Amino acid sequence: MSVDLVVVGAGVVGAASAYFATLAGLRVVVVERGAIAGGTSSAGEGNVLVSDKEAGPELDLALYSQRIWREDLAEHGDLWEFESKGGLVVAASEQGVASLRALAVHQRRAGVEVRDVTRSELPDYEPHLAPQLAGGAFYPQDAQVQPMLVAAHLLRLARAGGAQVRTRTEVTGFLRAGDRVTGVRTSAGDITAGAVLNAAGTWAGGIADLAGVHVPVLPRRGFILVTQPLPARTIRHKVYAAEYVGDVASSDAALQTSPVVEGTAGGTVLIGASRERVGFDRSISVTAIGTLAAKAIALFPMLREVRAIRTYLGFRPYCPDHLPVIGPDPRAPGLWHACGHEGAGIGLSAGTGKLISQALVGQPTDLDLTPFAPDRFPPAEEAPR
């Protein structure tokens, strides 16, 4: 079988890439060793955020991706429950408020909409917030989707345009003509292709290894608590503590927790967020879960009387410099990457897929991909450990 593009991975990034590549006229096959959205995409909160990003390439990509969600994909938003709910970042001290204000200055210059929120205004946004909080910032562009629905429907739309999706099909190696990648070997046979896109999420480093190139994507474990359903709009926005921004940008391998609380269309409340680098350890951390619950109650005291009905975990695809890997790999011509988005992959998926499709067909990309270059990392033997 021969196609224009093989996409490795059927999570949200792979699905978005397949969708936009199909729209661009490419013949596409998606191969996935498990099920659609069976990895990190099944364990995310569905964040489409600008609020948690400092000015720089990732924020530029987030703003671009917002445009793709709201324009290119607007007609399909109901399929994946796109909700432009806005994000409220809160601080417990005046010093924390000052830090939020300083961050907002640079975000506004980049194009982010931010409203300063005083202590007295916080109840107007969230009536159940703890009264001792010092202030915050509101980000009307923040939104939420259901990531498993995103992946499923984007792939359905891609199939309607002629793409093929092969689940339970594992990539075991690459086909080559000299140094050039010309396809993949899979558990179901070989597929030749003009290009192969590594969109394998947390497992993208392993796919890169098969091609003989180093892309340092590492798993960063996180837990989410889910509560019993509450009345509609009990919690109106995505609400998180100011220290969450620092945790997102941190490279620390140790456990970090900062409260993130938001409601869903079904009434349940999602509580995060923890980060730790423990490999692919799927054991439940009572410490992490207990800390998340305590910090969520500190933000919303009414949650003390609410039952948690389940918890789940996932692995964010972490890169050491906190930027995703997007674009062609000059070390292995024919190999492309769209991975390493860490906790921002849901929100950044739409923009990533559109940019990849533009580059694949030789169009100028709407955003400069240089900061996301796959070969920006030192060789594996030189990388810090």
Residue ranges and their predicted role:
Residues A137-G194:
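Helical element adjacent to the flavin cofactor pocket in flavoenzyme catalytic cores
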Residues E45-Y125, S258, A296:
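Dinucleotide-binding Rossmann-like beta1-alpha1 core, especially the glycine-rich loop
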Residues M1-V13, V29:
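Beta1/beta-strand and adjacent pyrophosphate-binding region of the FAD-binding site
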Residues V6-V8, I191-W203, I207, G353:
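Short hydrophobic core segments
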Residues Y19-L23, G46-V48, W80-E83, R180, ...:
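Active-site substrate-recognition segment that forms the wall
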Residues T22-S42:
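Glycine-rich FAD pyrophosphate-binding loop
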Residues D60, V89-S99, F138-R156, S283-A288, ...:
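Short beta-strand to alpha-helix junction loop
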Residues P147, D281-R385:
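C-terminal catalytic lobe of FAD-dependent flavoproteins
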